[in-house]
A protein has these predicted regions:
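Flexible, charged surface loops at secondary-structure boundaries
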Residues: 1, 38-45, 59-62, 93-94, ...
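Flexible glycine/acidic-rich beta-alpha junction loops that bind and position SAM and/or redox cofactors
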Residues: 238-244, 262-299
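Ser/Thr/Gly-rich flexible loops in soluble cytosolic domains mediating phosphotransfer, phosphorylation
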Residues: 66-92
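Core AdoMet radical
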Residues: 6-7, 11, 48-49, 115-219, ...
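A short, structured N-terminal alpha-helical element that caps or precedes a catalytic domain
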Residues: 1-67, 72-75
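Catalytic cores of alpha/beta
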Residues: 241-258
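Canonical Radical SAM [4Fe-4S] cluster-binding loop centered on the CxxxCxxC motif
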Residues: 17, 94-131
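Anion (oxyanion) recognition and catalysis
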Residues: 26, 162, 223, 255-256
């Protein structure tokens, strides 16, 4: 029996790739645990680490550690025997939801996104029932799909979610620009939730300023289906190809409609992007302090 060390370098939710690593090694009889640092490195036969973001600091790891994730290389892949393994929740005993992909890939080629490079064109990945394997998951499902409606089984999967009365979080967001009436109507029948499963939220994105007309049309479709603006959260990308004025216009347009903007800085080290994101995303400050007053106090 080998001893396997696991290290999650970033990310706020359980790491599915590391869960597959754990699942594979547990299946062949290995002992899997969290890696405890260089002082204990010699006790492990193999060490795996995952890094999702390039800006995350890299700790010192043994030379033979297997390091993967988009923060290291867009194109790296799990070995087939690990990719095909059933994820193990043993690393995350407090995880109280089911986690997985119903599809992978993306139909779009946004210049700021690595998904098309890493996953390619959309393809179906798992059925809803295949994802429901967490013994502590209850009726909570978190889907990691980057282009949910790009999968050919999107309708069957939504109907299954509705049938099973699952609370579902589309954590990567949905594309409201091309949302159809049928899709909006089925979403309205879902018990859609936020990341903590304690509020009714559907997450979309307004990344490009010029998509404003499409965003408004998508919001109207949601309203027509019975989804109120108060249930709509929008990722708002800043610092890529928009001006501060365009950032403010998108945020205030959404806020004035009763939707919830959530700013995503393209460059977290940029002073303006960091401050603007903090101002918008801290709801109490956003509602009570003007940007002109806040930005001067953060200089």
């Amino acid at each position: 029996m080998n001893k396997i060390g696991i290290m999650q370098l970033d990310g706020k939710i359980p790491n599915l790739a590391l869960m597959k690593v754990a699942g594979y090694h547990e299946t062949i009889g290995d002992e899997v645990e969290w890696y405890e640092g260089l002082l204990f490195a010699e006790q492990y036969n193999k060490i795996y680490a995952s890094k999702l973001f390039s800006f995350t600091p890299m700790p010192q790891l043994p030379e033979n550690a297997v390091i993967g994730g988009t923060g290291i290389d867009f194109y790296n892949r799990l070995p087939k025997e690990i990719e095909d393994a059933t994820p193990s929740y043993s690393l995350y005993p407090d995880c109280n939801y089911h986690l997985g992909f119903s599809m992978k890939g993306c139909r779009f080629n946004c210049k700021f996104c690595c998904v098309p490079k890493k996953e390619g064109r959309p393809y179906n990945y798992n059925t809803i029932d295949e994802i429901l394997i967490n013994p502590n998951g209850g009726n909570r499902l978190m889907l990691l799909d980057n282009d949910y409606f790009g999968g050919t089984e999107w309708k069957a999967n939504l109907l299954r979610i509705i049938e099973l009365k699952l609370k579902v979080c589309f954590v990567q967001g949905l594309n409201i620009r091309i949302l159809t009436d049928e899709q909006a109507e089925l979403l309205a029948k879902c018990d859609y939730r936020n990341l903590k499963f304690n509020k009714k939220y559907l997450t979309f994105a307004w990344d490009r300023f010029n998509d404003g007309k499409l965003i408004m049309q998508g919001i109207e479709r949601c309203n027509k289906a019975g989804i109120p603006n108060g249930h709509l959260q929008f990722f708002v990308l800043i610092g890529f190809d928009t001006t501060p004025e365009q950032d403010m216009e998108r945020v205030m347009t959404l806020a004035n409609l009763g939707c919830m903007p959530f700013v995503m800085p393209y460059n977290k080290a940029d002073k303006y992007q960091k401050a603007f994101a903090r101002w918008v995303n801290m709801r109490a400050i956003f509602k009570t302090v003007k940007w002109e007053d806040y930005k001067y106090n953060t200089n």
